[in-house]
C-alpha cells in the first residue's frame, strides 16, 4: 500500500519511498501512476526510489481540472521531498514527468542532482498530443483487461516485439476492472485540463531545458516516438553535448524503461549523479 501526505492545499498525495542511498524521484506520465516504474525497479542499483501519484491520479485525491497543471504537480513534488526530508534528488521523468523535471530545474535548481528524460523534450509534437487527446479522460471500450491487452498493439503503433504478457500488465496497471467494464485510474476531469493546455500556440519550453545547465542530463527516446522527434533530440544534444542519450528500437511513446538501451542510459546517469 502506498503512503500518503497532504499537499499544502490539503490534497492527499500518495507516494512510495523504498531503499536507501541516492534519492531518485520518479515522475510518471500524464495519465499514469507510480506503477510506471515497476518494470525498471528490478534493474536499478541500490538507491532510494521515491515515486508518487500526481493529484487526480491513482491513489491520490482529486482536486479539479484547474489544479492539474505541470506547475502544481512540480510544487507537489517539492512538497513530497520536503515531507521526506530530502534536500536533493535525481529525477527520472517519463513524458509529463520530464516536463515537471525541467520545470523543477528552472524553479528549484538547487533541489536537483540531475534529470533523466524518458521520451520528452522541449518540443512536443502535435501528432502525439492529438493521439493522447483521443483517449485522455475516457474509459476504454474494452470490457476486460484481457480484451484491452489484445487491442493494445493496434493502438500503440510504433511498438514491436512486445510480448502479450506486457500488454496485459499495462492493461492491469492503468485500468480497474468493475462490473460496468474497465475504468481509468485517474480523474476524468484531467481531460479538461489537457484540452485547455492543448489550445493556442505551443509554449517555448527551451528555456526550461536550458535551465538544466550545470546538472547531468540524460535522454531516452523511443525510436518511433510521435511525441519527441529526432530533430528535437538532436538539438537537445547540440545544446548539451554531454547529455547521455539513446534511441530505443521497437519503441514509440513511451519506452517501458526495462529495455537494455534504457537501462544502460539510466545506469550511466546514476553513475554521474552519485
Predicted segments with their positions:
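Alpha/beta-hydrolase fold catalytic core
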Residues: 1-25, 45-47, 86, 260-261, ...
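Conserved HGGG/HGGXW glycine-rich cap/lid loop of the alpha/beta-hydrolase fold
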Residues: 11-62
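Active-site loop/oxyanion-hole signature of alpha/beta-hydrolase fold enzymes
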Residues: 41, 50-92
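Conserved hydrolase catalytic core segment
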Residues: 87-126
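A catalytic-pocket lid/entrance helix-loop region that shapes and gates access to the active site
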Residues: 120-147
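Conserved alpha/beta-hydrolase catalytic His-Asp/Glu region
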Residues: 143-196
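Conserved serine/cysteine hydrolase catalytic core
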Residues: 178-238, 247
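Catalytic histidine-centered segment of alpha/beta-hydrolase-like enzymes
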Residues: 248-260
Amino acid at each position: 500500500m502506498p503512503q500518503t501526505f497532504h499537499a499544502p492545499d490539503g490534497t492527499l498525495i500518495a507516494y512510495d519511498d523504498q531503499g536507501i542511498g541516492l534519492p531518485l524521484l520518479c515522475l510518471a506520465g500524464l495519465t499514469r501512476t507510480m506503477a510506471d516504474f515497476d518494470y525498471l525497479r528490478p534493474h536499478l542499483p541500490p538507491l532510494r526510489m521515491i515515486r508518487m501519484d500526481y493529484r487526480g491520479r491513482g491513489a491520490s485525491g482529486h482536486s479539479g481540472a484547474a489544479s492539474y497543471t505541470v506547475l502544481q504537480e512540480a510544487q507537489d513534488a517539492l512538497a513530497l521531498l520536503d515531507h521526506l526530508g530530502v534536500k536533493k534528488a535525481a529525477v527520472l521523468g517519463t513524458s509529463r514527468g520530464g516536463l515537471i523535471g525541467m520545470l523543477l530545474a528552472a524553479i528549484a535548481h538547487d533541489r536537483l542532482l540531475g534529470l533523466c528524460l524518458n521520451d520528452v523534450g522541449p518540443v512536443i509534437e502535435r501528432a502525439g498530443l492529438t493521439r493522447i487527446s483521443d483517449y485522455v479522460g475516457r474509459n476504454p471500450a474494452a470490457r476486460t483487461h484481457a480484451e484491452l491487452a489484445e487491442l493494445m498493439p493496434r493502438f500503440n503503433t510504433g511498438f514491436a516485439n512486445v510480448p502479450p504478457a506486457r500488454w496485459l500488465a499495462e492493461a492491469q496497471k492503468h485500468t480497474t476492472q468493475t462490473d460496468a467494464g474497465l475504468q481509468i485510474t485517474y480523474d476524468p476531469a484531467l481531460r479538461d485540463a489537457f484540452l485547455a493546455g492543448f489550445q493556442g500556440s505551443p509554449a517555448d519550453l527551451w528555456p526550461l531545458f536550458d535551465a538544466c545547465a550545470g546538472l547531468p542530463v540524460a535522454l531516452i527516446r523511443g525510436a518511433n516516438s510521435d511525441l519527441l522527434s529526432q530533430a528535437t533530440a538532436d538539438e537537445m544534444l547540440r545544446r548539451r553535448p554531454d547529455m547521455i542519450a539513446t534511441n530505443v528500437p521497437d519503441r514509440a511513446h513511451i519506452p517501458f524503461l526495462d529495455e537494455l538501451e534504457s537501462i544502460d542510459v539510466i545506469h550511466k546517469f546514476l553513475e554521474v549523479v552519485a
